[in-house]
From Swiss-Prot:
InterPro entries: Anti-sigma-factor_SerPK, Anti-sigma_F, HATPase_C_sf
Protein's UniProt keywords contain GTP-binding: no
Protein name: Anti-sigma F factor
EC code(s) of this entry: 2.7.11.1
tRNA-binding listed as a keyword: no
Family per record: Belongs to the anti-sigma-factor family.
GO biological process: asexual sporulation; negative regulation of sporulation resulting in formation of a cellular spore; sporulation resulting in formation of a cellular spore
Main function: Binds to sigma F and blocks its ability to form an RNA polymerase holoenzyme (E-sigma F). Phosphorylates SpoIIAA on a serine residue. This phosphorylation may enable SpoIIAA to act as an anti-anti-sigma factor that counteracts SpoIIAB and thus releases sigma F from inhibition.
Uppermost EC category: transferase
Catalytic activity: L-seryl-[protein] + ATP = O-phospho-L-seryl-[protein] + ADP + H(+); L-threonyl-[protein] + ATP = O-phospho-L-threonyl-[protein] + ADP + H(+)
Keywords: ATP-binding, Kinase, Nucleotide-binding, Serine/threonine-protein kinase, Sporulation, Transferase
């Protein structure tokens, strides 16, 4: 492993931007293209927003954890919560599915993450939390 970071922050919506910027600053050492940087920032934003809104149901006292690691030219980003978990993971990963239609969310979070990253793994257990692992190979 070339480098690694870990970040913990309260599940407040204003910290989503902080998470994006922190991961961006960390991967700057790989000299990413603007497109790569935008893709990663968008995927991080979606994962953190899911943790806050769905995992913790907007309970700002809870903590979201992000870990990022660089191994050669690949970035791996893990976003984890200890929230309510996802009851039906297969259904949740379907485009346009949302468990909270009253919030006017698009239901495209997982689809966006899958589109902008090379791989997406989601692990979830009801009442235990969710862990999202995203990877992207950089064209450095």
């Amino acid at each position: 492993m070339d480098n690694k970071m870990r970040l913990e922050f309260l599940a407040k919506s204003e910290n989503e931007g902080f998470a994006r910027v922190s991961v961006s600053a960390f991967i700057a050492q790989l000299d990413p293209t603007i497109e790569e940087l935008t893709d990663i920032k968008t995927a991080v934003s979606e994962a953190v927003t899911n943790a806050i809104i769905h995992g913790y149901e907007c309970d700002e006292s809870k903590v979201v954890i992000i870990e990022a690691s660089i191994c050669e030219d690949e970035i791996s980003i893990t976003v984890e919560d200890n929230g309510i978990g996802i009851e039906n993971l297969e259904e949740a990963r379907e485009p346009l599915y949302t468990s909270k239609p009253e919030l006017e969310r698009s239901g495209m979070g997982f689809t966006v993450m899958e589109t902008f990253m090379d791989s997406l793994e989601v692990y979830s257990e009801k009442n235990k939390g969710t862990k999202i692992i995203m990877k992207k190979k950089m064209n450095t």
